[in-house]
């Protein structure tokens, strides 16, 4: 059987362009959370903000393997061993992966059983090898440098966490050439919209 491939940041950005064209959309505001922050910034840069009226990123690093001072991602400075230790269990030990992942993305109070079941079910809709391919490409892709191409209004939301940190959002907003807003969350964790 053929394994899925091509699930990259760039390909996802191209999918957005194709969907906007297919639906005949105008005046689009794109929002990307977590890894998808990199996808929407990649779209804006690659397609010169085609049909965009605004851009929003929520708690997502734009270059996880970067050694920059704003980057607190566990893959910082090409820490491949940490990436392998953190993400490969998705393939060979899914329960271990989800236990650690959910603890990392939840707010301080944790996640109740009903929300956890929903969250895991949503995550499992993507095959492990496809998810790993996309996440690895996300870590390798420098979308921080693409922020200087952004001229549409830009809002960045960030949560205080070890994985990301709030200095990241200030740096991102400072890089864009147009209007920007920063929104910081101090207690909600990576899933800020859920709590």
Named regions from a protein language model:
Residues 193-195:
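Post-His helix in hydrolase/transferase enzymes
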Residues 151-189:
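Conserved loop-alpha-helix segment in the C-terminal half of the alpha/beta-hydrolase fold
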Residues 67, 72-73, 89-149:
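Conserved alpha/beta-hydrolase catalytic His-Asp/Glu region
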Residues 41, 45-46, 51-89:
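Flexible "cap/lid" loop of the alpha/beta hydrolase fold
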Residues 2-6, 66-69, 167-168:
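Conserved catalytic-core motifs of eukaryotic protein kinase domains, centered on the activation segment
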Residues 1-35:
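Active-site loop/oxyanion-hole signature of alpha/beta-hydrolase fold enzymes
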